[in-house]
């Protein structure tokens, strides 16, 4: 089964409603598998998902990196910039870091924005 994450542009209230909905489903014994990341505005989402960061995500999804240094070398990019990108993506929940390793836990990312 593929792991997916859904990106949203929304308010804390929107995020809270999704949380409460998931909580109630868990209370009823339902399994809750969806993952969500909410950004306060479109600019924040686009800042987190620059073309270079998307390239990094795709690369790490294909092959997890043993370290940020190894990832920077593999991508042919400056270590400092790759480190910044990894930190931003990890803070957004789109990358995982464990014991120095960098991995992308999701197979698909979808985005939703209300007008």
Language-model features: locations:
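General nucleic-acid-binding
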Residues: 1-26
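Short alpha-helical segments that sit at the start of domains
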Residues: 28-55
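Short, cationic-aromatic polyanion-contact patches
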Residues: 43-50, 67, 97-115
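Short amphipathic alpha-helical interface segments
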Residues: 51-65
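A short acidic, leucine-rich amphipathic alpha-helix
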Residues: 69-75
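Basic amphipathic alpha-helical segments that dock to polyanions
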Residues: 71, 82, 86-90
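Glycine-centered, phosphate/nucleic-acid-interacting loop/turn motifs that mediate DNA/RNA or nucleotide
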Residues: 93
């Amino acid at each position: 089964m593929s792991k997916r994450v859904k990106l949203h542009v929304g308010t804390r209230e929107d995020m809270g409603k999704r949380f409460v909905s998931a909580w109630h489903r868990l209370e009823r014994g339902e399994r809750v598998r969806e993952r969500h990341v909410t950004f306060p505005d479109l600019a924040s989402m686009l800042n987190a998902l620059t073309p270079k960061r998307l390239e990094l995500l795709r690369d790490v999804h294909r092959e997890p990196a043993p370290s940020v240094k190894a990832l920077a070398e593999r991508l042919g990019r400056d270590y400092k910039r790759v480190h910044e990108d990894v930190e931003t993506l990890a803070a957004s929940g789109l990358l995982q870091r464990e014991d120095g390793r960098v991995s992308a836990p999701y197979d698909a990312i979808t985005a939703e924005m209300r007008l």
